[in-house]
Amino acid sequence: MYKAYFNLTRNPFELTPDPSFLFPTNRHNEALAALYYGVRRHKGFVVVTGEIGTGKTLLLRCLLRLLKQSPDVAYAYVFNGLLSPTEFLQYILADFGLAASGKNKGELLLELSNFLISRGSKKQTTVLVVDEAHHLSADILEEVRLLTNLETTEDKLLQVVLVGQPELDEKLDSVGLRQLKQRIALRARLDPLDGAETKGYIERRLQIAGSSQADALFSEQAIAAVHRHSRGFPRLINTICENALIAAYGRRLQRVTPGIIEDVAKEFRLDVIHEVETTGSHNGIVIPRATKGAPDVSSVLRRPVTRKQIWVRMRPFQ
């Protein structure tokens, strides 16, 4: 609707995760490097957590794009954690292209085991990627741990990537999952963007969408207002900016003003969300906290050869 008016070739603030729009902050680069390194080096478990709207699913899409470039990699992508253990196994097998219908749990495990052993004997990489992993029950998480028991003296046959909200960290801290937690090789955390990153994020998306003067569409004051109301969460930034462009188009303005941002924030009741946060309620978006546990991502990236290999593969996203 507003694309022609603002001389754009595509929607710059679509909510659908699109890897071509990835804004490579240091945190996102490190998280993507940790994911790719963990999978390609057969580290076993890799965990990434972050609040709602910090770009976790987009990060996974970028990882899957990288993995598709490698003919020796096969992955199953699970995005529904609200499954029974048997349904979870059926989903995994089906995504790997294996027969799953009508089989009981024992038969499913045998089929998957044979698949992993066969691929392992050929030095191939097999990956289980779980989005929204905070929804997984303790039973399923334990099932996943048991799947990783399949290993040779030299290698792990199944690589597992768990991505979810901070509740996943809390689950992994439970006594019943202590064995799984001990197997986590790499962890990364996605935090909201700071003010400078929010500005860069908005301008990059506008440039990718065809704007020749990205800084002309949103004033500095408007971008500051976007950051204040979104608190740096990319999903909220997209929502605010999308509706701000629609409002500017409707008013026949050539630039988004701070007043428009304030109107959008009121319409979406973002001030109410902020009030819930400041009162400490757990129903709103809480301020991210540091993750403790497995080795820090930065320590992994200090290895020269490995780091070079990873960043070469990641260039399309920078």
Where are the regions that the model predicts?
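Helix-loop-helix "sensor" segment of P-loop NTPases
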Residues: 98, 118-121, 161, 169-234, ...
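Trafficking entry modules
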Residues: 2-3, 9-13, 256-318
